[in-house]
Amino acid sequence: MFRDGITIKGNKEGLNVIININSFKDFDEMLDAFIAKLSKGKRFYKGCTLRITTQLKEINERNTRKLKDILFDEFLIKDCIFEDSDENKSKVFSGIYEGRTKFLRRTVRSGQIIKYSGNVVIVGDVNPGSEIYAGGNVIVFGILRGDVHAGSTGNDKAIIAALRLQPKILQIANRISRAPEDDDKPDYPEVARLKGDAIIVEPYSPNKFNI
């Protein structure tokens, strides 16, 4: 029998799901309980933003992806935000910036503006004419061609990374860079960061960036 380890509350941003992962014997038991709870009002969650607060250190990356896939594919939620129940131990982006993360699994289209106080992770493209503002890092698993501002609250340790980094305007903290006029567009992942007073862009290396 499932323990009462999942609470769902409404807030102005959407729905907050509080999961006490330690109330369950393992991740699969928690997932079964979560699905059963959501299934009671499945259509209610369509288009909603879910903020999931739990002990992130107890959930590995594979299970996090599994949970997100179910929420997006079966319940058709709009956004999914993971938040550590112990913010001081949040390990979402260990080594560069630790904090809350907003996940978007869609294309950000022209005219759309995304703002968040923590990290922003986008699984999809960011089209020209769109704008991304993050207090932490901006990570795009796709082509980034819009305007992007990481470290918007002054965090000069923030980075911007994408599979194809082609923004019109790129800003980290209070430093701004514009796209070059030439047509040379690398076809490999790149990372932008501050070095001194300038923004530098370099190929992504897993040995150098722990993201």
From Swiss-Prot:
- Which positions make up the signal peptide? none
Question: Which keywords does this chain's UniProt record carry?
Answer: Cell cycle, Cell division, Septation
Keyword check for Magnesium: no
InterPro entries hit by this protein: CAP/MinC_C, MinC, MinC_C_sf, MinC_N_1, Septum_form_inhib_MinC_C
User: Which PANTHER family does the record associate with it?
Assistant: SEPTUM SITE-DETERMINING PROTEIN MINC
As for family, the record states:
Belongs to the MinC family.
Q: What is this protein called?
A: Probable septum site-determining protein MinC
Taxonomic lineage per UniProt? Bacteria, Bacillati, Bacillota, Clostridia, Eubacteriales
> Its gene?
minC
